[in-house]
A protein has these predicted regions:
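Conserved ABC ATPase "signature" region
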Residues: 96, 100, 107-125
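Catalytic Walker B motif of ABC-type/P-loop ATPase nucleotide-binding domains
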Residues: 154-157
Length: 172
């Protein structure tokens, strides 16, 4: 379960997220809807600790989430709007790097990488560097990377943007 209490984020004089109280139960699907600039991406960045709140708190299974809680951070994975991957690395290297960040055994990283790249129809492109991938392929790789650690909480910020219709359908 993930819960926020009075979650607020300000940037100078602009309040992007204002006193958000939210409770999402285990197994529940939840969407943030709103126009551009409504604070959806900022909220996701706060929930994943990419940003720190100005005030308020985030609880994972009743425990306060901070950047100093790797045990709780391991439960969360995020797919951001931006292609946040090193452009000079290939797919295998991206997946290896992600797995090592979470102290996964190499054998498990290799097994999950194979499984996920196959699932997303990327296996034959695995040695291409990120800079040589299409937008849709980058997006699929971000999905693979996010699922690698088998997270309990998956935060998605426009995960199928840039994908063709068939890829979007496969993803959902």
């Amino acid at each position: 379960m993930i819960e926020t209490k009075n979650l607020t984020k300000t940037f100078d004089n602009f309040t992007a997220v204002d006193s958000l109280d939210l409770k999402i139960e285990t197994g529940e699907f939840f969407g943030l809807l709103g126009p551009n600039g409504a604070g959806k991406t900022t909220t996701i960045s706060l929930l994943s600790t990419l940003l720190l709140p100005t005030k308020g708190e985030i609880l994972i299974d009743g425990q306060k989430l901070t950047r100093n809680r790797p045990d709780l951070k391991r439960k969360i994975s995020v797919i951001t709007q931006e292609y946040s991957m090193r452009q000079d690395m290939n797919m295998d290297e991206i997946m290896e790097y992600q797995g090592r960040l979470y102290f996964m055994p190499r054998k498990e990283i290799k097994r999950r990488t194979e499984e996920l790249l196959e699932f997303c129809d990327l296996i034959k492109f695995r040695k291409r560097t990120v800079r040589k991938l299409s937008g849709g392929m980058k997006r699929k790789l971000m999905v693979c990377r996010a699922l690698l650690t088998d997270p309990e909480i998956l935060l998605l910020d426009e995960p199928t943007a840039g994908m063709d219709a068939l890829s979007r359908r496969q993803m959902w």
